Amino acid sequence: MASSLTHPPPPPHLPSLNPKPNFTRRSLLLTSTATTLSFPSLSSSAIQPPNPTITDRIFMEFSLCPNYYLPNRTLGDTISTLCSDSTLLGRVILGLYGNLVPRTVSNFKSLCISNPNSNPNSSSYKNTLVHKVLPGQYFLAGRQGRPDRGEVRPPSYLPRNTETVDPKAFALTHSRPGIVSLSLSENDDEDEIKFDPEYRNVEFLITTGPGPCPQLDNKNIVFGTVLEGLDVITAIASTPTYQPGERIRQFNDLAEFFGDERAQNARAIWNRPLTTIYISDCGALEVTKPSLTPSLP
């Protein structure tokens, strides 16, 4: 009997795992077009440039007071009572960037238009000190504390400023004299005030020149510029300040190393003007039309 041989079916055809590509100019063009349509690139609309439009104008008048640190002052004396014969240093006009950092500008403006004479419990920059001057860099004002010491009453009623943690708020740089900035890295409010849950930072700095201050960039919020009165800023910057000797600095560094709190208290008077400079008046001015920041030297 003849037996028939059975043959197994042929294996299925498997495509090559690494087929040789067959590219043509047309296929490359179509692939490139499809990729462009499917994955749009980052455009200028995705990353918005800073908007330094001046939406608000503020005036500040700075004065010199010869009597503020007299030894015979009483406990109830304030700048308004001690400095009745002060000398006006000049008026400064500030332009604020309300579109870029609206909350920072709003809080700053609130303390400029507040009137402590009509409401003793309100917070205001009026009758507060320029408490620190760093020659060739900037000066600080708006330190919080006791009004009788020329400090700003803590403004716990202000809205919380969430721009301090918003990267977009740090877009502008301290590139020239006359930059107005919310002091964050240079803030020297006492820890007792900073640790209050209702703490609102209102300390500010103004760069004095002659050069830029790149060490302030990305650490403090630029929210305005000096429009008029740069000569007043220069006069404040030229005021003599208290500078400790090298031996005192070494002792202070050693005390800080060992955690002595008195080291920080001692540094509070470093760079303090030897002549009392204070904000004798401040308020808002009308803005007829928002404008871009002018170029300053």
Where do the model's predicted regions map?
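Cyclophilin-like peptidyl-prolyl cis-trans isomerases
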Residues: 2-297
